[in-house]
UniProtKB/Swiss-Prot annotation:
Protein name as it appears in the record: ATP phosphoribosyltransferase
EC main group: transferase
Name of the gene encoding the protein in the UniProt record: hisG
Family of this protein: Belongs to the ATP phosphoribosyltransferase family. Short subfamily.
GO BP terms in the entry: L-histidine biosynthetic process
Reaction equations catalysed: 1-(5-phospho-beta-D-ribosyl)-ATP + diphosphate = 5-phospho-alpha-D-ribose 1-diphosphate + ATP
Length: 228
């Protein structure tokens, strides 16, 4: 939710060093849209709409919080390395990234979907070594290894549905919500690899050093999640 209230703290500067405050990393799209009501419960409202701006750093109505807008896959990296104090990322992204150096504190129970395999409708399972197109290279390898299948994984960054249609891959691995995009391209979901929801993660050093700032926000967000 956008808010036209100004942040009049004279020490508030969204650019540059922000040691006196908290930096929150979010990604555009569904996660941002579904996270904003939870942040509102903690008194954090954006002063501008990221969907209508080219800016990447945004002030909020909370005097000690600014928000970074990133690619979803970059959120764990920013939090892990201390460029952001906390963030919201999908469980799929966290598992793929291998974010061992952050605390995963809360399942926000938003942006729910499934990581699944998918292929052309009615196709026979190919013999021999499979070709799998995906942006989830690590999770894909782990999944097929658990089945005892050898696969060649082809890294893509988008439009996964195209791969089986043009012979680039036998199957894809991607997140599935309604399945409408798959069906529109003659594909069908097959096997579920994992259920996915968005998680609140915190930099380990920030969790200790900025605990007095973080604790009230985390408690209010958790309460908002529990009341949904």
């Amino acid at each position: 939710m956008m808010n036209d209230m100004r942040n009049d703290d004279p020490n508030f500067n969204v650019m540059g060093n922000f040691d006196h405050g908290l930096t929150l990393a979010l990604s555009k799209g569904r996660i941002l849209k579904e996270t904003l009501p939870l942040l509102e419960a903690a008194g954090i409202n954006l002063l501008e709409d990221p969907e209508k701006s080219r800016k990447l750093i945004f002030p909020t109505t909370h005097q000690k919080v600014r928000i970074l807008i990133l690619r979803a896959s970059d959120v764990p990296t920013y939090v892990e390395n201390g460029a952001a104090d906390f963030g919201v990322a999908g469980k799929d992204v966290l598992m793929e990234h291998g974010a061992q150096h952050v605390y995963e504190l809360l399942d926000l129970k938003i942006a729910n979907c499934k990581l699944m395999t998918a292929g052309k409708v009615g196709m026979q399972h190919p013999k021999g070594r499979l070709k799998i197109a995906t942006k989830y290279v690590n999770l894909t390898r782990q999944y097929y290894a658990s089945l005892g299948e050898q696969v060649d994984v082809i890294k893509l960054y988008g439009s996964m549905e195209l791969a089986p249609l043009v012979g680039l891959g036998d199957y894809i691995v991607d997140v599935v919500d309604t399945g409408n995009t798959l069906r529109a391209n003659g594909l069908e979901p097959l096997e579920e690899i994992m259920k996915v929801s968005s998680r609140l993660i915190v930099n380990k050093a920030s969790f200790k050093r900025k605990q007095a700032l973080l604790d009230p926000i985390l408690a209010q967000v958790e309460e908002a999640v529990n009341q949904r």
